[in-house]
Curated annotation (Swiss-Prot):
It is an enzyme of class 2 (transferase). This is U-box domain-containing protein 27. Its EC number is 2.3.2.27. Functions as an E3 ubiquitin ligase. The lineage of its organism: Eukaryota, Viridiplantae, Streptophyta, Embryophyta, Tracheophyta. One of its GO terms (biological process) is protein ubiquitination. Coiled coil: none annotated. Residues 9-83 form the U-box domain. The gene is PUB27. Keywords: Repeat, Transferase, Ubl conjugation pathway. It catalyses: S-ubiquitinyl-[E2 ubiquitin-conjugating enzyme]-L-cysteine + [acceptor protein]-L-lysine = [E2 ubiquitin-conjugating enzyme]-L-cysteine + N(6)-ubiquitinyl-[acceptor protein]-L-lysine.
Amino acid sequence: MRKDDLCITVPTFFRCPISLDVMKSPVSLCTGVTYDRASIQRWLDGGNNTCPATMQILQNKDFIPNRTLQRLIEIWSDSVRRRTCVESAELAAPTRDEIADAIDRVKIEKEERDDREVLSKIVRFGRESDDNRGFLAGKDDFVKLLVDLINQVDFETTSAAKSLVVQEAVKILSTIRSKVSDRRRFSNLILTNGRDRLSVIVYLFKTGNVELKIDCAGLLEFIAVDAESKLLIAERDGLITELMKSISKDSDLSLIESSLSCLIAISSPKRVKLNLLREKLIGDVTKLLSDSTSSLSVSVTEKCLKLLEILASTKEGRSEICGGDGECLKTVVKKLMKVSTAATEHAVTVLWSVSYLFKEDKALEAVTSVNGVTKILLLLQSNCSPAVRRMLTDLLKVFKVNSRSCLSAYDTKTTHIMPF
């Protein structure tokens, strides 16, 4: 239940001017102001002879019951109680038996009725627990049923109600994907003999709200199981552009994370990498990493660095990473420490790729300009993995060969850890 669901707005004229509570027995004084009987009685019993709201002297202390207002308050109170009961029933997690019946209903009548309400109930059930997600994923032909629902829509001609049904189906597929035992078969259901299903998911990612975008990105990430599926997804019109819009600093943090995960999942084919570079992904990732006004989660930082690591495997990517004034590499150096072990490994791999493996001259200048050598030396003293230690050692060799002066400032304090 959301916080807003707990707030009930009470009409001002239903409140007693003294207690500010909803009046149980409204009565009016000779001044025309209405109070709750108990509150105004206490006021008068206290020796007061004025109207509390107007401070006029009371000509008499007679109470006139306000029957009309009392009836309005009763009607309003009944409606609030009914609405609260309905909302509580809707928000309560359905049982497995109820869900099994709901699934059977969708199977039998999927062509004849609006199943949005039923599917919404299944979404709530799936998001309730890991066991529930496993239960849904294990239901015979349920996944295929949901995929078939997606295949039945054409957003140019389909009714709004049917479109909402498809959205709920996508939410369920995204919710239960981690419990699907055969990921490749799941991917084939969506991608094989039904390219329109992929178009629907991409369309929903482009046009949906934040929650739906996150579900679509997660689903696309999950079905990217091999080079063929990655290419099919990445080359769908407008998807990469939309994913890149979703990683802007102004986007929802969860959407940024899911979009980065999707980009990582589809980026391994070289054709996709080159497409990402043409779309200036490195610039967008650099802006995201270097933005001092936003507090990125550790996970988002790791994913940004992972993307840079992937793109650094191409000549064009390395050129872009080292381009301009070296802002991208400088940002990577700043993320070498104090983020996480995974972030350190990705950042070191980026530096190793451009500086040691492919010996980009601009990389050496950028790294030394932000005291990168100091951080490399400090990392060698840390509890890093053997693979990272080897890359750090290689980096120091490159810096020593290319410019002994960049190490001279650190000789007195760090010579004891020099690996050569």
